[in-house]
Every structure is written in C-alpha cells, then in structure tokens.
Amino acid sequence: MMIDLPIDYNSILDTIVENVQTIPFRKRYWLIRTNSGTFYDTFKENNFVGLDHSQISLRDLSRLRARFHDDFLFLSAIKESVADFYTPDLETGERTKNDRSISLIANQIFKFYTQVKKGDLVIIPSYSSSKVAFGIVKETYIAEFSEEELDRIDVAEQFLNKRVEWIEDFDRVSLDPNIYKMFTAHQAITEVGKYADVIERTLQDFFVLENEAHLIINVQKEDGINARSLFGLGYNFLEILEDVIYALDIKNVSSNDFEVEVNINSPGKIDLKSRIKKGTVLAFLTLAVFGGGYESKGYTLKSDGLPGLIKAITEAINEYKDREQDRAMQKAIFDQYKDKLNVKEVDDMLKIMKQVDDNQDKPK
C-alpha cells in the first residue's frame, strides 16, 4: 500500500537556495570611458573594450610584468616609463605632464592591465551618456587581435584591449538615478563596485549579492505613481506572502525579514531584499504565481530535478491562492494595485529555474 507523505516545503526551498548562484565576491565593476562616445560603437560592434596606452607599448608592459611580479614594483615601473614618455621641455626643463597626471595615467594602465578580469562587469557610455552599455569581460589577459580584426578595427592597435560579451544597453533616462552618480567620475577607467546592487538590479529581477537576496519588482507606469497604489501593492503582497508562509508551514521566514529600496521614478523599481534567502526565493515564486505565471524569453527546462521542486512550491502556492473565496478577493486586490502600477511580470523566473537545474548537474 502506497502512503502519500506530506511534502516538506522547507527542504524544497533549502534545496533551491543551495543551487541559486551567488554573484561572486571577486566580481568587480568598471566604468570605462569612450572618449566622449567616439569609441562607443566601435567597442559595441566589435565586442571589446580598450584603454589608450600610447605612453607605453604593450611589449614594454609585458616585459615589465615579467620582471616585476609584485604589483607595487610593477606600478612604479609603469610610472617611470610614462614619465619618460613626457620628456622635459628643453628650455624650462619641466615635463609636459606634472607628477599627478603621470601617476593618474600609470594607475589607469595598471588597473586595466592587471585588475580588469574575466567575469567582471564593464559599463561604457555613449556621447553625453545618452546610452549606456553593460557587458561581461571574457578574458583576463590583453586580447590578441588577428590581422583581419586589426584591418577592420582601425583603432585597435592604439588600445590595450579585452574582449567583452555585451549584455544589454539602455537609454540613460530609463536607468536608476543612482547610476547617474557614476558618471561624475571622468577618469578613463573607474571601479564602481559601490554601485553593484544598483547595477545588478538594472540587469536582473532576482540575484544574491554579498549574502543578501534581492527581488526586483518593476513598476512600468509611465506617468506619476499614485501613493496609495504603491504602498497598497507592497502591503498587500507582504500580507499574501505571510499567508503563504503560514499555509506551507515555512520555518524561520517572515515578511518582517525584508527591507525595501524604492526608485520612485516612473517607471521605477522596488527592491525587496533580505539576508534570509529562503524567504526571498519564496517571495519570488509567490510574485510569479500571483503576477500571472512565468512564460519568459524562450527558456526550456528539463522536466525533472530542481524545476520539479520549484513546480511543487508554485503548485502549492497556486492551490493556496485558489482554495477559498477570501483569497480570490485578496488576489483581486493585489491585481488591482499591480495593474494600476503596470508591474512587469517576473522575467527571470525560467532563467532562475534553468540556472538551478544547470547547477544541479555540475560536480560538487
């Protein structure tokens, strides 16, 4: 005789959390200038980023690196080479660049050569930063271009180059205002890791950064956002989540675990975040179910494995949602707020499901 054992939703959520990829601690974020947009299209169309290094040749850089493995000594050697490039004026004996400028140039070359690594995220602005492109660095070492590439990309030889896979570009007006602060830095290359959460929520609906899980709700309403609708959406969603937690008997999770960061632009983003990753995953799945499902971007999945576990959770939430009349009323209220704010469906649902399934197949 077969006995149907109760489903342990806590174990299912724990398994999902274990397999959701965390943004690596070593990942860095770089703003790379394009000479007032001059090289924006060249970088985009040819899948690379570059830094002018006319003050020192790549051959000399490679020679210095082979000689000086210590970063401090390597940087000092670069500074000496850059200083030699700016020869003193014959009449005054002064260099055409002061020590501060020489140090700045050397530091930029050093950063690009040694610190921009595979897996890092790069951001490039067009003219007046009207467009901004985001990409992932594909190699740590300086790119070696073929003769054909050098013929096609007429500026390639004047740069230190690294290959990039471009993810997406955005009109500046559609970006989170907090990203604008990056563009106050005018150096050729600037590390912008302090904006990591803002950058990631521009690109993803769900991510884990520095042990904190983020669920992004995209509000797409074009004109002014009604305060009652905005706060009603948040309150009602957390009430639904609290009921789901109770109905599925989820342990050590509460709607009180969440903090919120709101970009109140129209359109804008609501960032629900918590260090209780299990709760954020449950909120993600709940939003997907109450938001209308998870058809997205043509992703296909295996029928077994972790997607099956995710399916069990979402089916349970669906069953909860449909069980009683007052829950139907609760969903109607949520839908009313969601529709007023034109909240985007959760695009990353199938991507996350595919991600955790792929992770399950990797050797531990």
Task: Annotate each PLM feature.
Residues 115, 125-131:
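Short, charged beta-turn/beta-strand-edge "cap" motif at the junction between a beta-strand
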Residues 139-164:
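Short, solvent-exposed secondary-structure boundary/capping segments
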Residues 329-363:
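Extended, charge-rich intrinsically disordered regulatory tails
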